[in-house]
Amino acid sequence: MAENGEEKLLAVARHIAKTLGHNESMADDILQIFSNFDGRFSREKLAEGQAGEDGSGVATLERALNSIDGQISRFVAADQPIWADPADSAAFLDTIDELVAIIREWSPMASEKPIGICLTRADDMMQQAMFRIEEEFRSLMERGAESFGLNPQGDAGAMNHRFDSEEEEDDDRDFNNGDDIQIPVAQPLTDYDLIIDALPSATINDLHEMAKRMLGAGFGKACSHVYSSCRREFLEESMSRLGLQKLSIEEVHKMPWQELEDEIDRWIKAANVALRILFPSERRLCDRVFFGFSSAADLSFMEVCRGSTIQLLNFADAIAIGSRSPERLFKVLDVFETMRDLMPEFESVFSDQFCSVLRNEAVTIWKRLGEAIRGIFMELENLIRRDPAKAAVPGGGLHPITRYVMNYLRAACRSRQTLEQVFEESNGVPSKDSTLLTVQMSWIMELLESNLEVKSKVYKDPALCYVFLMNNGRYIVQKVKDGDLGLLLGDDWIRKHNVKVKQYHMNYQRSSWNKMLGLLKVDNTAAGMNGLGKTMKEKLKQFNIQFDEICKVHSTWVVFDEQLKEELKISLARLLVPAYGSFIGRFQNLGDIGKNADKYIKYGVEDIEARINELFKGTTTGRK
């Protein structure tokens, strides 16, 4: 009994020495203290017992490794997938867990040669197991992707609800409850209103168990690489089926504009599907496979989505730094608005540290698109300035530059809110009463009006010059009044330009018809009846000649606006008809000359009205 107690006491002493001795020197010191305290704790007795115990421990370790080695060798050599049989997969994972536990337990004693040799063997076995589990992981990823299903869902609200943050948190908590998890597939998508199944929940659970072992064994990078390569290939296929080509910036710039317009439409669809459906689904899939390992999930997600994201961003960047020809404005606006609307998705989907570069690049390219839009307006200004004053427009009609600029600005103002945002983000300072977009539009209008003033000088006839300005001025006012451009420029601008048009009207009248009116004025100081009759007869003769000439010429001129044309005719009739009627009435009452007045009077009052009504019947093509 005493001997048994002494053995226990020695065992306790050995255990204390082994536990407290962090290295061989410290253990020797502890043994020396015990030996000095009691002769029974001699260093020889304690050392002998410890040696026997350690030898037994190494043997136990070797036996455990032999057993595990046999199991791992069997699984590694298996021709069939281990995860084809749930019992095999469970046994394989248990074996790995045993090996991990042994390595962790014995690693603190790795400096002891026999144990170090065993641990080296254990590491080799672990590497074999990891190679096999990596193969199984890849195979399961590929098989799962092949078994996807695509199911349209009619309720858009339900789809949006699936993507909100609360739903994601609930899904994370319920990772192991067996519920199906919706993830993206490489199918042609024409609507965001979809529920997509790619990997069954059982497959996700299996992948998670594998990932947990690989990460726990220090093979996290290998696991992330396999996962990322499989999902990246799948995601790129999804983007391809959405119609998105892999184009370099140079290829985009060389593409004919009509083809590029179609490519932009495809890009917009692909960007929306990617940011609203595919990327969020990949994010959730990563979180489930790497549940409990947030860094691995973040890194894997970034590796999966980086290529497709860069493809999307590079295309948008190519548009931003490409040609700034004015006709490209509307498609550039489409790309800008798409990027703007997707900014919340960029912020939420790429919120982790690994994706910050992608997130920041998206913001940079979005701002660059805004710069491109402002640059396009500068190019429009240059186009107006450079438009030459060469051949005159026949009949003083609409100039093509007027029609182009006004229709362009009207179309642009349909995106008024976007343009206001673009110009507010520039370095300009708005005035107290107007936005920077208003300032920009006012400046373009001023350039256009100045350009038209120069072009009007091409006409040698001053009256035709004013008809040209009147036509183009009226067209400008009408286009401003009828759309959002009027909201930008304001009622005061419209009133001022209506006054301008009326001034052109008056100038036209003065430059041509006021001379006619002068011929119908009679100087009462003329000497005698015969002198007055002779004067009136000469004036009537000149009136007939000039009236014929003016009507002949002005009937070929153009006034495109029917209301303006009627206003002009009424104004001329009011000016001319009463004066002419008074003149011929007086002429007819001049005694003998008056009796023969019909010989000199070519037109009656009604004839004058009819001839005035025939004015401005030149072609009105190009009015749109």
UniProtKB/Swiss-Prot annotation:
GO terms for cellular component: cytosol; endomembrane system; exocyst; extracellular exosome; phagocytic vesicle; plasma membrane; vesicle. Interacts with EXO70B2, SEC5A and EXO84B. Binds to PUB18. Binds directly to B1L at the plasma membrane and in small vesicles. The keyword Cell membrane applies. Keywords: Cell membrane, Cytoplasmic vesicle, Membrane, Transport, Ubl conjugation. Pfam families: Exo70_C, Exo70_N. InterPro entries: Cullin_repeat-like_dom_sf (IPR016159), Exo70 (IPR004140), Exo70_C (IPR046364). This is Exocyst complex component EXO70B1. GO terms for molecular function: phosphatidylinositol-4,5-bisphosphate binding. It is found in: Cytoplasmic vesicle, Phagosome; Endomembrane system; Cell membrane; Vesicle. Disruption phenotype: Twisted leaves with small spontaneous lesions, early yellowing of leaves and anthocyanin accumulation defects. Chlorotic shoots. Retarded growth with wrinkled rosette leaves under long-day growth conditions. Impaired abscisic acid (ABA)-mediated and mannitol (drought)-promoted stomatal closure. Increased number of lateral roots. Plants impaired for both B1L and EXO70B1 produce more lateral roots than single mutants. Gene3D superfamilies: Exocyst complex component Exo70 (1.20.1280.170). Target of the E3 ubiquitin-protein ligase PUB18 that mediates its ubiquitination and degradation via the 26S proteasome. Its main location: cytoplasm. Component of an exocyst subcomplex specifically involved in autophagy-related, Golgi-independent membrane traffic to the vacuole. Regulates autophagosome formation and autophagy-related Golgi-independent import into the vacuole. Positive regulator of both abscisic acid (ABA)-promoted and mannitol (drought)-promoted stomatal closure. Involved in the regulation of lateral root formation. Belongs to the EXO70 family.
